[in-house]
């Protein structure tokens, strides 16, 4: 029976085998299924006999281990009269999000004057089993029974509590799955199957209003007894407007039309076009702008007054920039302000024509400067070697002797003359005291150079071996105006 029902059934919101869909994906909260409702119990003549109350709400379930879990709490109760005898029923069930039963307790009673009757049933899930406990009391006699079903064989089981929620889901969807077949328990606590069928729509009068109802019929097919069928007239929001038990003269019906709740339609947020802000025309914004502008101006002026060196640095830079007018202003600025950096290495004394980039790292710049110094030393060594081999001689004509000037060597004028006069004043150097010397004029420097002859011969026609060589690159010797008298004694 169970496998057959599971194979043939199709579940809406329950896990009932192939083709099933879990209710957790249907959005119970979006359907607004949590609300109470009350119906009046009427006899076949329309007289009130009692009332039926149904409520579905969120709750918490505490298991045997003391663990609390969220659940759906279904509570229904009725109380009325049957043939002038008090009767009633109650239902309390706990369901998980898949409408699977966790615990359920139901009770029915009829207080007949002679033999009162009471029937109780408890369904409890323990481990992987569903334990059904049933007791029937008729007068003083009580019968009890316990049935155990494995949970793996109860896929698609619809309890009385799950039936209440499932009907509200069908009302929201205004449809019933075709061939909907589920497992259920009959009045004797035995496992059977139930079916749901749509009977279409019908308009009924509720007070002064008319409403269209969606009719669903549930039938419990018991193996030992006749089928038990109920018809449910449902409003579009899930409210139960009428309940009719097939074969019973009475019914349950609402006496007042409830406020039909519709699913909230989330409207997109309004979009507002951005208007251009012309702050110059806004008096408040323009006033704030002027105040802030004046505040910044005073702050800048105060800072420059406290730090005059800043204005001096900028003025110097602009002056050098306008004087040199470089093509690359950024590089020029980096070279100008580079020496002010605290981590910059000192500038070398000798620089090549290839200036290092101011944006290179310090290590690269130091390596480049070392290479440049080595190249400069090599170039100076080569120039000194060439100067010794090739000495450009400037010939100065005289009567008998020549004065050679080496233009490659750099000797300061005052240093040369000091050494010259020092030698001249030393009397031991010269054997001949009667040495006549003349002054000659050298252009640009206005210096007098006296040439002397310290040889032992008396012949003036013989050239002296000791000639004076004057090294000066910046001295221009005029051969036409210089008269050198050698050995005029």
From Swiss-Prot:
It holds the Pfam family CATIP_N. Expressed in testis and ovary. Strongly expressed in pachytene spermatocytes and round spermatids compared to spermatogonia and somatic cells. Expressed in Leydig cells (at protein level). Keywords: Cell membrane, Cilium biogenesis/degradation, Cytoplasm, Cytoskeleton, Membrane, Nucleus. Residues 363-412 have a biased composition (Acidic residues). GO terms for biological process: actin filament polymerization; cilium organization. It is found in: Nucleus; Cytoplasm; Cell membrane; Cytoplasm, Cytoskeleton. It comes from the Eukaryota. InterPro entries: CATIP_N. Residues 350-412, 438-489 are annotated as: Disordered. GO terms for cellular component: actin cytoskeleton; cytoplasm; nucleus; plasma membrane. Belongs to the CATIP family. Interacts with TTC17. Plays a role in primary ciliogenesis by modulating actin polymerization. This is Ciliogenesis-associated TTC17-interacting protein.
């Amino acid at each position: 029976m169970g496998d057959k029902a599971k194979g043939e059934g199709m579940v809406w919101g329950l896990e009932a085998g192939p083709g099933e869909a879990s209710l957790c994906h249907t959005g119970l909260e979006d359907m607004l299924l949590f609300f109470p409702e009350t119906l009046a119990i009427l006899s076949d003549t329309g007289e009130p006999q009692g009332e039926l109350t149904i409520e579905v709400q969120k709750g918490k379930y505490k298991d045997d281990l003391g663990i609390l879990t969220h659940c759906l709490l279904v509570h229904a109760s009725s109380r009325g009269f049957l043939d002038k005898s008090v009767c009633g029923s109650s239902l309390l069930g706990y369901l998980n999000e898949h409408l699977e039963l966790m615990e359920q307790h139901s009770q029915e009673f009829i207080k007949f004057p002679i033999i009162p009757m009471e029937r109780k049933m408890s369904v409890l899930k323990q481990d992987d089993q569903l334990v059904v406990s049933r007791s029937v009391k008729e007068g003083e006699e009580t019968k009890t029974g316990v049935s155990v079903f494995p949970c793996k064989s109860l896929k698609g089981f619809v309890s009385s509590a799950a039936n209440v929620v499932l009907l509200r889901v069908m009302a929201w969807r205004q449809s019933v799955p075709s061939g909907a077949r589920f497992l259920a328990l009959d009045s004797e606590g035995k496992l059977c199957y139930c079916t749901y069928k749509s009977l279409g729509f019908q308009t009924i009068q509720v007070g002064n209003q008319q409403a269209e109802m969606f009719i669903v019929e549930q039938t419990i097919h018991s193996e030992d007894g006749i089928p038990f069928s109920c018809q449910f007239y449902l409003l579009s929001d899930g409210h139960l407007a009428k309940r009719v038990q097939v074969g019973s003269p009475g019914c349950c019906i609402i006496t007042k039309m409830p406020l039909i709740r519709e699913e909230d339609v989330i409207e997109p947020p309004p979009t507002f076009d951005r208007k251009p802000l012309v702050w110059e025309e806004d008096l408040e914004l323009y006033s704030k702008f002027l105040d802030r502008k004046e505040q910044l101006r005073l702050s800048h002026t105060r800072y420059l007054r406290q730090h005059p060196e800043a204005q001096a640095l900028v003025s110097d830079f602009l002056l050098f920039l306008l004087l040199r007018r470089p093509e690359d202003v950024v590089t020029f600025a980096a070279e100008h302000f580079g020496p002010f950096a605290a981590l910059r290495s000192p500038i070398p004394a000798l620089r090549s024509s290839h200036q290092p980039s101011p944006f290179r790292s310090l290590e690269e710049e130091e390596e480049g400067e070392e290479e440049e110094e080595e190249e400069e030393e090599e170039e100076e060594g080569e120039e000194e070697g060439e100067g010794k081999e090739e000495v450009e001689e400037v010939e100065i004509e005289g009567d008998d002797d020549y004065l050679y000037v080496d233009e490659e060597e750099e000797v300061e004028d005052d240093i040369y003359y000091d050494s010259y006069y020092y030698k001249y004043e030393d009397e031991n150097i010269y054997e001949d005291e009667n040495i006549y010397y003349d002054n000659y004029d050298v252009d640009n420097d206005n210096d007098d150079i006296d040439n002397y002859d310290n040889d032992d011969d008396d012949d003036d026609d013989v050239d002296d071996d000791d000639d004076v060589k004057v090294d000066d690159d910046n001295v221009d010797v005029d051969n036409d105006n210089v008269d050198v008298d050698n050995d005029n004694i």
